[in-house]
């Protein structure tokens, strides 16, 4: 049996909670652990420096600074630029530690032994240092929990995790599946090589080919544009896999922001996507199934879950030594 959309019980794990909406007087606390939150801290430090002298990053807007620029500044850059990045890492780590402690007070999180840190900020040395510093802060405060960076590149983990939405029997005789990772800035679709002969637990699964659409950079994009792009891209990926004799399982796994209902609709949390994805009249899995009813000779099965859950699922093969973990 294949899980329903947004299911709590999946083939390898049970999802106690996701899309946690913990608020304080500044809003949702989870927003303060994002890549954007780190840049906000950098900008505040730069503002202080501009009042009293030169900005070591010049005229470049904080939102335009790349992860490589942060890494270079910390490793070999101007001493004041390094100081800004180091200060931002410290402030961010303190904030992340507070957020994790707040989450651990929740019933669903209280027995968590390990937390996997993903997201776009993870894919840099500065991000790894921030994770390490947060771990030190928590342990020094007596919080017994392990923090680890996500193994795969975050952009790929969101696709690889899609393979864990379906039972492994569905993949017998097949080489790969289709995965979709939907975000407020980008949408990705790709072919995930399952590599089951190398690792039946999917620990060797990898992205064989993928396409990216930076929809946030375009004007007047709506949800119909997103569906059209996905359908066209999935058909291209199916053709590419067929050309290379890579046998696709009749399955599409989707990671999407928000609270996912069993019928594939989105209750809330999709406000950053183009158009109104929370409408009761919009159902992405049904639309994709209508456009791609079969993959090869088999009927297409589609499962959609929250994007953070799907990214976290890419770590499932490496979590067998703990009972409860989060991401």
Task: Name each region found by the language model.
Residues 2-37, 64-115, 119-138, 147-158:
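Helical "lid/coupling" subdomains associated with nucleotide-phosphate turnover
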Residues 100-114, 230-252, 292-296:
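Phosphate/pyrophosphate-binding loops at sites that engage ATP/ADP/AMP, CoA/4′-phosphopantetheine
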Residues 123-155, 211-228, 246-252, 258-324:
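Glycine-rich phosphate-binding loop and adjoining helix at the ATP-binding site
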């Amino acid at each position: 049996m294949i899980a329903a959309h947004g299911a709590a019980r999946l083939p390898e794990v049970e999802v106690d909670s996701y899309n946690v909406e913990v608020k304080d007087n500044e809003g949702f606390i989870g927003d303060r652990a994002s890549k954007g939150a780190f840049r906000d801290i950098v900008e505040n430090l730069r503002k202080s420096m501009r009042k009293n002298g030169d900005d070591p990053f010049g005229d470049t807007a904080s939102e335009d600074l790349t992860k490589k620029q942060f890494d270079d500044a910390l490793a070999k850059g101007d001493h004041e630029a390094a100081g800004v990045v180091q200060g931002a890492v410290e402030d961010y780590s303190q904030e992340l530690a507070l957020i994790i402690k707040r989450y651990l007070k929740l019933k669903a999180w209280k027995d968590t032994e390990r937390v996997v840190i993903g997201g776009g900020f993870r894919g840099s040395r500065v991000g790894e240092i921030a994770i390490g510093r947060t771990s030190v802060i928590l342990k020094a405060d007596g919080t017994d929990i392990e923090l680890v960076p996500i193994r795969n590149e975050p952009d790929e983990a969101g696709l690889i995790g899609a393979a864990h939405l379906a039972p492994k029997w569905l993949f017998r005789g097949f080489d790969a599946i289709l995965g979709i990772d939907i975000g407020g800035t980008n949408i990705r679709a790709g072919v995930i090589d399952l590599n089951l002969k190398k690792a039946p637990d999917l620990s060797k699964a990898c992205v064989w080919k993928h396409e990216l659409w930076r929809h946030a950079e375009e004007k007047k994009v709506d949800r119909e544009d997103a569906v059209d792009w996905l359908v066209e891209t999935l058909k291209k990926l199916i053709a590419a896999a067929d050309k290379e004799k890579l046998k696709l399982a009749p399955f599409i796994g989707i990671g999407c922001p928000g609270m996912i209902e069993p019928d594939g609709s989105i209750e809330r949390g999709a406000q950053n996507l183009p158009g109104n994805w929370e409408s009761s009249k919009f159902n992405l899995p049904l639309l994709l199934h209508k456009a791609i009813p079969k993959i090869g000779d088999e009927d297409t099965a589609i499962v959609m879950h929250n994007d953070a859950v799907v990214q976290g699922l890419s770590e499932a093969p490496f979590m067998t030594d703990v009972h409860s973990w989060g991401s």
